[in-house]
Curated annotation (Swiss-Prot):
<dbReference type="InterPro" id="IPR022663">
    <property type="entry name" value="DapB_C"/>
</dbReference>
<keyword id="KW-0220">Diaminopimelate biosynthesis</keyword>
<comment type="similarity">
    <text>Belongs to the DapB family.</text>
</comment>
<keyword id="KW-0457">Lysine biosynthesis</keyword>
<dbReference type="Pfam" id="PF01113">
    <property type="entry name" value="DapB_N"/>
</dbReference>
<feature type="binding site">
    <location>
        <begin position="123"/>
        <end position="126"/>
    </location>
    <ligand>
        <name>NAD(+)</name>
    </ligand>
</feature>
<dbReference type="GO" id="GO:0005829">
    <property type="term" value="C:cytosol"/>
</dbReference>
<dbReference type="InterPro" id="IPR023940">
    <property type="entry name" value="DHDPR_bac"/>
</dbReference>
<keyword id="KW-0520">NAD</keyword>
<feature type="active site" description="Proton donor/acceptor">
    <location>
        <position position="156"/>
    </location>
</feature>
<dbReference type="GO" id="GO:0051287">
    <property type="term" value="F:NAD binding"/>
</dbReference>
<dbReference type="Pfam" id="PF05173">
    <property type="entry name" value="DapB_C"/>
</dbReference>
<dbReference type="GO" id="GO:0016726">
    <property type="term" value="F:oxidoreductase activity, acting on CH or CH2 groups, NAD or NADP as acceptor"/>
</dbReference>
<dbReference type="GO" id="GO:0008839">
    <property type="term" value="F:4-hydroxy-tetrahydrodipicolinate reductase"/>
</dbReference>
<comment type="pathway">
    <text>Amino-acid biosynthesis; L-lysine biosynthesis via DAP pathway; (S)-tetrahydrodipicolinate from L-aspartate: step 4/4.</text>
</comment>
<dbReference type="InterPro" id="IPR022664">
    <property type="entry name" value="DapB_N_CS"/>
</dbReference>
<protein>
    <recommendedName>
        <fullName>4-hydroxy-tetrahydrodipicolinate reductase</fullName>
        <ecNumber>1.17.1.8</ecNumber>
    </recommendedName>
</protein>
Length: 269
């Protein structure tokens, strides 16, 4: 079997370094390119330098050259560079795995449009456990239905720049969808001062940013006399990286916009 050629954007970042290991660990993939922004001190270094691997792939800022020798790009960077990479992937018919969060509506529309021309897997979280959690939340929300106050609490490391996390927002979207609500209309982001009684139709969000928390997410359903909590805690970024590589292998040869639920076969159940 010919190995799938995977390039990584933001290879010198926290996720990028773990992705190098994940690609190296998978029996059916090989690292074909490593991207960093112009001016990065890592340019020219071996892509595996930070994790003790010798990949033979030099870190580059030449997107065109990297994509020309790759089957798929994995991108966990920021919205602006991700959208630029997305356009290049469409032009060169290279699949893309997007783990970047914080897109506005225009960015999400661009991703959706790209799915008409190449293979795109766009997910708020690539952890298998988190995606099973999404599946559970849909079931729980439908069964409990009305009468429960819903709150989502998430925590991440001090360096995370967007809040709430993409995973927390996706949890809210899943719950709202199961209840026939529009998250944009019912979400409450933080509370301060005299807020008055809680509106039972709302879904609340609370955010923690501290230390080196990789990712903690809890969905709370509370009513008089009982409380249901569904929690996922990540202790290593490898869970996200391994899921992204799994998605890259799965989307090979496909065109369309998919999420991790598709990769795991959960949308067919």
């Amino acid at each position: 079997m010919i190995p799938l050629k995977i390039a990584i954007a933001g290879v010198n970042g926290r996720m990028g370094r773990v992705l190098v290991e994940a690609v190296n660990n998978h029996p059916d993939t090989v690292l074909s390119g490593a991207l960093e922004h112009s001016g990065s001190e890592a340019l020219g270094l071996d892509a595996g330098y930070a994790v003790g691997l010798k990949t033979g792939i030099a870190i580059s800022d030449d997107v065109d050259t990297v994509l020309a020798q790759s089957d798929v790009l994995i991108d966990f960077t920021r919205p602006e560079p991700t959208l630029k990479h997305l356009q290049k992937c469409v032009e060169k018919q290279v699949n893309i795995i997007i783990g970047t969060t914080g897109f506005d509506d225009a960015g999400k529309a661009a991703i959706q449009a790209a799915g008409e021309k190449t293979g795109v897997v766009f997910a708020a979280n690539f952890s298998v456990g988190v995606n099973l959690t999404f599946h559970l939340l849909d079931t729980v929300a439908r069964v409990l239905n009305e009468g429960y106050d819903i709150e989502i609490i998430e925590g991440h490391h001090r360096h995370k720049v967007d809040a709430p996390s993409g995973t927390a927002l996706r949890m809210g979207e899943v719950i709202a969808g199961a209840l026939g609500r529009d998250l944009k209309q019912c979400a409450v982001y933080g509370r301060e001062g005299h807020t008055g009684p809680r509106d039972p139709s709302t879904i609340g969000f609370a955010t923690v940013r501290a230390g080196d928390i990789v990712g903690d997410h809890t969905a709370l359903f509370a009513t008089d006399g009982e409380r249901v909590e569904i929690t996922h805690k990540a202790s290593s970024r490898m869970t996200f990286a391994a899921g992204a590589v799994r998605a890259a292998v799965w989307v090979n040869g496909k065109t369309g916009l998919y999420d991790m639920q598709d990769v795991l076969g959960l949308n067919n159940r």
